[in-house]
Amino acid sequence: MTPKLKLNNNINWTKRTIDSLFDLKKGEMLEKELITPEGKYEYFNGGVKNSGRTDKFNTFKNTISVIVGGSCGYVRLADKNFFCGQSNCTLNLLDPLELDLKFAYYALKSQQERIEALAFGTTIQNIRISDLKELEIPFTSNKNEQHAIANTLSVFDERLENLASLIEINRKLRDEYAHKLFSLDEAFLSHWKLEALQSQMHEITLGEIFNFKSGKYLKSEERLEEGKFPYYGAGIDNTGFVAEPNTEKDTISIISNGYSLGNIRYHEIPWFNGTGSIALEPMNNEIYVPFFYCALKYLQKDIKERMKSDDSPFLSLKLAGEIKVPYVKSFQLQRKAGKIVFLLDQKLDQYKKELSSLTVIRDTLLKKLFPDMTERTKSIKDY
């Protein structure tokens, strides 16, 4: 449950320069030979994710840092000791009694877009430390209010971190199970009592078991922002909704062109098959669609690589129909085997949706708590 904020709206909020609250120090260069995959500490430089690992650190945990070269403006609060690279800048509190660390982090995070706007350069962007020092951020001297804001936002971040971990664990488990299932790993089949697959599984083309349908063009203005039936085109996620679907539920789609060419999707509700997508509808009721969805997801990387090697990458209905997938005639075996991987895939999708939804809520709340000073009194009453 999200804690209810009890903020004093009459507290005098002000703007303070970053330089008046923090001691800023630019990171150090790390020699390439000191970067090792087995290193004890993360090495953060110009990217949002770590740039590798190393066996030494130069910054203690619970330190705020801002990227000043590369992915400029990204604000991070480290929970472990790390090596701060030269494209990073650390911000240490000048007076911990005046400013709560997590409140300081969220105050900076709320201004991340403004920090990003300080960047200059065409190829590799940079932020001048002098410009960063002069940037003003929202500040209140009331420690109770600082703690209330920090604690509330921390609840969201802890859940987001937990979800990210669950997503990674479930993705690895799903991929491992799919590999063992479709490569007919003897120990795996024995554990799940699927030994019959050893003799019954063989390859078949998609065109022998599915009907194919090209996506239909639909103007963006004809799509709805909200609705019951999602519109899927050449993007992995839906890009709007429609009043009437053109494809049934329990179907598969393959993205046929664009950046996400070859990506596989499963549809558990009726949907609109748009431009850049190919719908796969089972020919009969003896096909357990999730089994073939899992098989295609297992083959997805190979499919994408084959398509990208073409001078003009495009997946036609003919080529889609020629894709070979593992097949077993028994519907019961399809169902029993497919469910093992499919349930993990559904759980993974559930975690991803929760992560996306919670991120939007957290970011909205962050902006509500740290808006422009002229707007704060009005908007904070919503919470």
Swiss-Prot record:
A GO term for molecular function: DNA binding
Region (TRD1): 1-142
Pfam family, one: Methylase_S
Spans annotated as TRD2: 183-330
PANTHER family associated with the record: TYPE I RESTRICTION ENZYME HINDI SPECIFICITY SUBUNIT, TYPE-1 RESTRICTION ENZYME ECOKI SPECIFICITY PROTEIN
Family: Belongs to the type-I restriction system S methylase family.
Protein's job: The specificity (S) subunit of a type I restriction enzyme; this subunit dictates DNA sequence specificity. This bacterium does not encode the associated endonuclease or methylase subunits.
Protein name per its UniProtKB record: Putative type I specificity subunit S.MgeORF438P
